[in-house]
Amino acid sequence: FFQGSTDFGWLFPTPRQYTTSPTRMAKKGDILLSVRAPVGDMNIANADCCIGRGLAALNSKSRSDGFLFYVMKYFKQVFERRNAEGTTFGSMTKDDLHSLQVVCPEPGLLKRYDDIVSEYNKMIFTRSLENQDLIKLRDWLLPILMNGQVKIK
């Protein structure tokens, strides 16, 4: 169960809470967008999950989620500029989200984009998951190495 950007990591959220009665779901691969301050922070769901009111789950009708992710990265800059100018923007509604104007390339160009970018995104996602596993291993090993439970020869 993810409530907002507090649960976000570099690319994937970290589970801190669980629920037995989920109401709003995100599917693996959906873009999780923070719709409460700080508006615009993003992560990618690395498993099917439940989301709270502080998040929106986005995906592309054309299944070009890589393109959508980078378009939303652009909007993150727009949100940050609005915040820097002092405009109150503590939350985003469904209507606000639907009113964002996105220029969508024609399907052939979008497919070519996906053909190139999707392989790089897969590598980034795989390495990010590997890094999470290595961090867990480090956090488990370091204390037992420091207190002498395990010795390295």
Which stretches of residues belong to each language-model region?
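DNA target-recognition domains and sequence-specific DNA-contacting regions of bacterial/archaeal
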Residues: 1-104
